[in-house]
From Swiss-Prot:
Pfam families: CC_BshC, Rossmann-like_BshC
Keyword terms, alphabetized: Coiled coil, Ligase
Broad EC category: ligase
InterPro entries with a match to the protein in the record: Bacillithiol_biosynth_BshC, CC_BshC, Rossmann-like_BshC
Coiled-coil intervals, chain numbering: 372-435
HAMAP family (UniProt xref): BshC
Name of the protein: Putative cysteine ligase BshC
Entry GO MF terms: ligase activity
Family designation: Belongs to the BshC family.
Enzyme Commission code(s) on record: 6.-.-.-
Length: 484
């Protein structure tokens, strides 16, 4: 079942009317103070500080793992949707930096397209949350890979970060801070203490949220859906970080991370000493987010929408109204060389993103049709000459020899025409192959949609108008951004 259909079937809140109905919900009483301190440490632009005032109205929240250079372009499309919705509601646009995530494979690669060649930097990162990974050991490799772009003042500012997650947050501020985007890093020293009350409550009933998820999963299955979240017996929705981040299980009145056992009191003492060590799993993270932030709207991708759809029971358990859910905008950047190719074949960029080579060959068919038509007409002339010889044999034998000479001359000329036609078509086929290759590199790198590979910061560094074009783009649906 499609994620959007599932959300409708479950009757979950969607749309701007639902967003407006959820405004003016209070966040954590120390939220503004903590965020102001966090933004001050990051030397955020004034627009981000001013956005804190709009938290009194509410927040439209989105989030993503802390990828290099802001991660793939979909990060900026999420932020764009959140900012547009927030502006329309008079609320703040907040970006949750998923610094607690320890899946480093998702964030250790940076892909850039330069001189028509995709280049990749892969960092060797420890299996830790990105909020724990220092940037210093990787700073020079990043600078070298970025080349002249590393001298851009925005990247100079971002590369001053202490950790990988801070680098990500600084990139967001450098490129989107002037639009008032407010990053929120739950592992930041200023912000992590805001989750203590939520942690205390979860520790008091450690299986309650997991059971709520499993009940909702059964409901979704009954509707024909495939719920992505399911908690194993005894699994909680909390991770504990020691030498690495491990899921906690609860049985017989005690917790275990598979290495040692803990009482609830011991875990609470760990959390009080350093609240960033006890963090929520995917099934609890949005609820923890909304216990601290005055979330009225939540912008997600299609896969996230599926797992958020399972959380209505967890929201109810915490006495929270689920925020209005919105799918992010989907974007594709079209630079001048690609635009010329697309226009030549009258090919829509999204058709190529969806179907790749098949869409291109369909569009190229019209370009090759004249060659085929001309070849068919030459073949027709040869066949007509042969028919004339056959008719002459029955009509007047004296015409046979001259008509055979005529057919031979026509055949010789036709063969020369055929060779020239093949050479011309081969040249055109070479052009087709070159054009197809260029489209793949730009729009479907590594066989994936562009928005999942190249960072939007790359386009902003290459094209001065890239951020303005994004700001002017629709906040929902599919968007083609023509640059250059």
């Amino acid at each position: 079942m499609e994620a959007a259909c599932l959300v409708r079937s479950l009757g979950l809140p969607q749309g701007e009317e639902a967003l407006k109905a959820r405004l003016r919900r209070p966040g954590h009483p120390r939220l503004r103070e903590a965020l102001a301190a966090y933004l001050k440490r990051l030397q955020a632009p004034e627009e981000a500080f001013r956005a804190l005032e709009r938290l009194e109205v509410g927040a439209v929240v989105t989030g993503q793992q802390a990828g290099l250079l802001g991660g793939p372009a979909l990060t900026f499309y999420k932020a764009h949707t959140a900012l547009c919705l927030a502006d329309r509601a008079g609320a703040a646009g907040v970006f949750w930096v998923a610094s607690q995530d320890h899946d480093v494979e998702e964030v250790r690669h940076l892909h850039l397209l330069r001189d028509e060649v995709p280049e990749t930097l892969s960092l060797d990162l420890p299996p830790l949350p990105s909020g724990r990974i220092p940037l210093a050991p990787h700073r020079e490799r990043l600078r070298a890979f970025l080349g002249p772009w590393a001298k851009d003042y925005r990247l100079g500012y971002a590369l001053e970060a202490e950790t990988l997650s801070e680098f990500f947050a600084r990139v967001l501020l450098a490129f989107l801070g002037e639009r008032g985007l407010v990053p929120f890093d739950p592992m930041a020293e200023e912000l992590a203490p805001l989750f203590l009350e939520a942690l205390e409550r979860e520790l008091s009933d450690p299986l309650g949220s997991a059971e709520a998820i499993n009940r909702e999963a059964e409901r979704i299955r009954a509707l024909g859906g495939k719920p992505p979240l399911r908690r194993k017996p005894g699994a909680t929705n909390l991770f504990l970080e020691t030498d690495q981040r491990r899921l906690l299980f609860y049985e017989g009145g005690a917790f275990t991370d598979g290495v040692r056992r803990y009482t609830a009191k011991e875990l609470w003492e760990i959390a009080r000493a350093d609240p960033s060590r006890l963090t929520p799993a995917a099934g609890l993270r949005p609820v923890f987010q909304d216990l601290v932030l005055p979330t009225a709207g939540f912008v997600v991708g299609p896969n996230e929408l599926r797992y958020v759809a399972e959380l209505s029971g967890v929201y109810a358990r915490y006495g929270l109204a689920m925020p209005a859910l919105f799918l992010r905008a989907f974007g594709v950047v079209v630079e001048p060389p690609v635009r010329r190719i697309l226009e030549k074949y009258r090919l829509d960029p999204w058709a190529f993103v969806d179907e790749g080579e098949a869409a291109f060959l369909r569009a190229a068919e019209a370009w090759l049709a004249p060659f085929r038509a001309f070849r068919d007409r030459v073949e027709g002339l040869l066949q007509e000459a042969s028919r004339l010889v056959e008719e002459a044999e029955a009509l007047e034998p004296n015409l046979v020899r001259p008509l055979r000479r005529f057919r031979a001359r026509v055949g010789g000329e036709a063969e020369r025409l055929r060779r020239k036609l093949l050479a011309a078509q081969a040249a055109r086929d070479e052009v087709l192959a070159r054009h197809l290759g260029r489209l793949k590199v730009h729009l479907l790198p590594f066989g994936l949609p562009q928005e999942r590979v190249y960072p939007y910061a790359m386009y902003a560094l290459r094209h001065g108008e890239a951020l303005r074009r994004l700001a002017e783009a629709p906040w929902e649906g599919r968007v083609a951004l023509y640059l250059g």
